[in-house]
Structure formats: C-alpha cells, structure tokens
Amino acid sequence: MYFCKRNLQNKIITYNMKNLKTIIFTACALFSLGAAASTEHTTVQGDHGKLDVVIQRPDNDAANDNGSQANAKAKAGKKTPLLVLCHGFGGNKEGKLFDCLVDSLNKKGIAVIRFDFNGHGKSEGKFEDMTVLNEIEDAKCILRYASSLPWVSKIAMGGHSQGGVVTAMTSGQLVAQADKDIKKIQAVVLLAPAAVLRDDALRGNTFGKMYDPKNPPAKIEMWDGKALGGNYIRTATTLPIYETAKNYHGAECILHGDADRVVPYTYGQRFHYLNKKSEWHLMTDADHGFGGQEEQAAHIASDFLAKVLK
C-alpha cells in the first residue's frame, strides 16, 4: 500500500448466455483484460481511507517486466505514459465506457490507473462523507502514487461526470499551486463533465432529491441505501469549478453528448471556451454515459492522448 504525503485478483467475469444485455455490457471488459497483459490491484491511502486501485499496462510493459533477460535489457529505460481515470457521482471504476477506454489506450501503449473514490466501490469511507473537495484530495493521492512509479513517463488525467469536475479542478489547482511530488499533468480528458452539480445544489435538487439549499439536512437518502451528506451540498453551492479549471492551459479533450439529460452539453462546452488548446467533440445522440457509443468516445479520447503523450 502507498501512503500519500499530505499537508492539508484479476477478476473473472461470468455471465448467463440468456442475458444479452450483460453480454454486451461486459464485452469491452473482456477485451480490456485481454489487451492489458499486466493488471495489478493495490490500495492507496486517500483522504478518507484506503482507495481501491487497478493498474492496467500495455503488452510491451508486461514483456519488459516478465520477458527474457535479453528482452528486458533491450527495453531497459523505456517508460510508459499513464492516464489517471476518475469515475462519477455514485459510480465506481468499472463500466463499459472505462473498459473500452482502457482497452483502446493499452493498444496504443498507454497505461491506465483507475480507482474508486472514498465511499464508492471497494474503497473505504462513507458515501455520506464524500464531497467534491475530498475527491480532489483522493485524486492528488493517486497522482502522487502514479508519479512515484519508476516506469511512468508522462501523466494525464481523465474523468467522467463528477469525475470530470474533479479532473478539471485538480489540474487547475496543480497549476496554481504545484506539488513537488506530482508530475506535471500533460493532458486532460473530460467526459460529460458535470459542472451542473453546483447549479443543482443551488436549486436544491440533486438527482431529483429536493432540499432547502440554504439549510440542507444532515443527510439525504439517495439510492441503494446510500445517503448524501449535507456537507456535499454546502460545499457544492460555492464550488469554484470553472474559476479553478481555467488555470490549466495544456492539451485538453472534452467530449459531451447532445442527448445528455443529466448534464446539458453547454456545461462541457464552457470548459472548451476556457482553454484555447482544447478540443471539443459534441457527439450526436449520445447520452450522459455515452450509451451505445462508448467505443466511439473511447477512440476519440485515446487518439487524442496518443498524440499528446507518445
């Protein structure tokens, strides 16, 4: 386990042949595991407990680590670019969109670290204690860990939905206040970034759950037994999303669907307006999760990262 400095088993997927939906959903996951010859599970100490982490490296890296001595010598000193991938609100590091992205990146020689934020997936912490701000701290812990890996060359960040907000704000913060233990963020990918979360909190409506934004309750019951803490709402109403994100002026790729009913695409487009070096991809008929277009979104993002990082 890696402990971040802070001031402030391979899993076999089984499915029922009668369940076509599950087969389609897991297809990219199977391809991803096949393409990533080296898959490592670990934990990293985050802001609110240990974070569950999966590192997936391309075939050439596995050969360098596990191949013949002659081959290892030939590849000695070769390093690999890496993407740190952040999931959205109430989600986790799994899912077809991320599986397709990992598969596409591994094929292009780029490694990926994906992880569960505090209170999500297999990571420690309570969901009701989660805020965007402590997710930013989680992301920085992962970035410090990634920066410490001897085989990593360049680092990029990417995120979907709230993970996109975390990515945008983290990359902006690290420009305004550099961290000596974190390598420079060379590229950013935002997938349907949910900057609407601040406006939702100000309206007193988060995923259909109504409340008084001026006096939020201690917690709000959401789904699957999860409760959203009042501190999430209080911090969200004053979250300087765009004000922080605008500090990052490096390579950036922003993807959004014009059929997104969770986060209108104009919220993603505003990130594009803030950065002259950014690419803007508005995908026709794509929803918030890019359902049915996951592979297309993954190829756009991976082509961009291959161009910037290799």
Feature map (PLM): residue ranges:
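Alpha/beta-hydrolase active-site loop
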Residues: D129-L149
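Alpha/beta-hydrolase fold nucleophile elbow
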Residues: P150-S161
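Conserved alpha/beta-hydrolase
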Residues: V102-E124
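The serine-hydrolase catalytic nucleophile loop
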Residues: G90-V102, F117
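Short beta-to-alpha linker loops that shape the active-site pocket of alpha/beta-hydrolase fold enzymes
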Residues: F89, D116-K126, A194, A286
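Short beta-strand element of the alpha/beta-hydrolase
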Residues: K78-G88
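The alpha/beta-hydrolase serine catalytic core
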Residues: L51, V165, T170-G172, D181-L282, ...
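N-terminal cap/lid segment of alpha/beta-hydrolase-fold proteins
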Residues: A37-G67, A72
